């Protein structure tokens, strides 16, 4: 008696094919020699081998280029001298995610604004020579608890949903001597978009200057300092009263224990087993920018010692939407963690401006792609002990390292490394006059 056939199961998305397709589509527009080298770099980052070799690109790339003459040197040369425009790579990766993955942009408010997050990270370079290493600045190191010399990078991330999982797609990276300079460079290099946008930032980035340059098209929402001082709108000028109309109204300190006056909204929200008080003030402004109106939301949660202050220029958002918008800031920090732990962002091993910029930017790009591909695939357990596996970038990198050869073959499909040959030009001997015989 024949055994009954098993019920057909839905085919799962193969992460190896997705990751290989992502790399192939990103690098296919580059020149042939450069594309092969950059592809090998991305493969070492996707598989976590660059972290395993402590950031040594030559050792990590050697298994993929051993058959080539000067193989690892070609990879290093592509990173230092290849014709690569990072913004083009970011745009191609962004397009690939929407074409090949079930990605949907997060939208908020009646204006249906797309949500973007901006944050900065400090890549510590304690042993780097100041004269030799480029793009060095000063940044605070949490581990050392002091300011150290470092490469400071700021990243712009677009927040999307993939199968209900919130992830961030890196769109731009910029560097600077300080965090403020790097963030300002990111704001100056924003990609053009016909849709209205909402940028989520943290307290160090939500400065008065950033609120001032925010527009109706590109609004800003960010956390404010606890000691921030704001002004209410002035009372309307009475008819017949002499003098100019007032620019500022009463002073408001929304972060103190008892703010002045009454808020425009005062509600209580039930979260799990506790009640959270939420207050909102309309049409406030900084003393330095009286024409820039913002709404401020204060959240008093019993689980935290300090209140959470959020300000936004998108005043059409409801109080609940402002709280949701600020929570969308976390994907950009997740990209930094993935790039550090899986793609060796903290170990650039580069000293020129081009090398530092490409090593750190490609690590952020690889980390974001790992996170998005993992969200689109089924959970990948590390072993029989991993009973509660989740869709994470680290598990995906471990899976790709187990299939590294097949993954590299698919990722570099259609790309042929440039063949170098030594050109021997026979030099003609100089026709010198023979010396006269004695």
Predicted segments with their positions:
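Short, conserved catalytic/metal-binding motifs centered on acidic residues
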Residues: 60-61, 111-126, 156, 196-205, ...
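Electropositive, glycine- and tryptophan-enriched low-complexity nucleic-acid-binding patches
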Residues: 68, 74, 139-196, 296, ...
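Extended, non-catalytic structural segments that build the interaction scaffolds
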Residues: 40-50, 304-329
């Amino acid at each position: 008696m024949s055994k009954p056939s098993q019920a057909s199961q839905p085919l799962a998305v193969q992460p190896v094919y997705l990751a290989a397709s992502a790399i192939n589509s990103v690098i296919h527009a580059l020149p042939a020699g450069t594309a092969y080298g950059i592809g090998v770099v991305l493969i070492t980052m996707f598989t976590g081998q660059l972290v395993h070799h402590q950031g040594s690109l030559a050792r990590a790339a050697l298994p993929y280029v051993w058959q080539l003459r000067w193989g690892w040197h070609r990879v290093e040369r592509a990173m230092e001298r290849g014709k690569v425009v990072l913004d083009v790579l970011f745009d191609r990766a962004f397009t690939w995610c929407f074409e090949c993955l079930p990605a949907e942009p997060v939208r908020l408010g009646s204006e249906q604004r797309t949500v973007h997050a901006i944050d900065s990270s400090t890549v510590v370079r304690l042993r780097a020579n100041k004269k030799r290493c480029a793009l060095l600045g000063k940044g605070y190191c949490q581990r050392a608890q002091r300011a150290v010399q470092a490469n400071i990078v700021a990243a712009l991330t677009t927040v999307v949903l993939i199968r209900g999982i919130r992830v961030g797609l890196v769109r731009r990276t910029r560097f600077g001597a300080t965090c403020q300079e790097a963030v300002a460079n990111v704001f100056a290099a924003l990609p053009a978009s016909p849709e209205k946008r909402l940028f989520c930032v943290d307290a160090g980035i939500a400065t008065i200057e950033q609120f001032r340059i925010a527009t109706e098209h590109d609004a800003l929402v960010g956390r404010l300092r606890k000691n921030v001082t704001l002004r209410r709108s002035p009372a309307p000028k009475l008819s017949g009263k002499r003098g100019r109309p007032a620019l500022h109204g009463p002073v408001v300190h929304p972060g103190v224990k008892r703010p002045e006056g009454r808020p425009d909204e005062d509600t209580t929200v039930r979260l799990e087993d506790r009640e959270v008080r939420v207050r909102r003030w309309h049409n406030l402004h900084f003393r330095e920018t009286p024409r820039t109106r913002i709404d401020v939301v204060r959240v008093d949660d019993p689980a935290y010692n300090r209140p959470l202050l959020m300000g936004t220029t998108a005043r059409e958002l409801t109080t609940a939407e402002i709280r949701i918008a600020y929570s969308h800031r976390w994907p950009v920090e997740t990209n930094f963690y993935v790039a550090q732990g899986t793609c060796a962002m903290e170990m650039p091993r580069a000293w020129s401006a081009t090398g530092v910029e490409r090593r750190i930017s490609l690590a952020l790009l690889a980390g974001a792609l790992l996170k998005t591909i993992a969200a689109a695939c089924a959970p990948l357990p590390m072993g029989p002990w991993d009973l509660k596996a989740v869709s994470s970038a680290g598990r995906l990198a471990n899976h790709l390292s187990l299939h590294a050869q097949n993954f590299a073959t698919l990722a570099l499909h259609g790309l042929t490394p440039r063949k170098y040959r030594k050109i021997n030009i026979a030099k003609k001997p100089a026709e010198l006059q023979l010396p006269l015989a004695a």
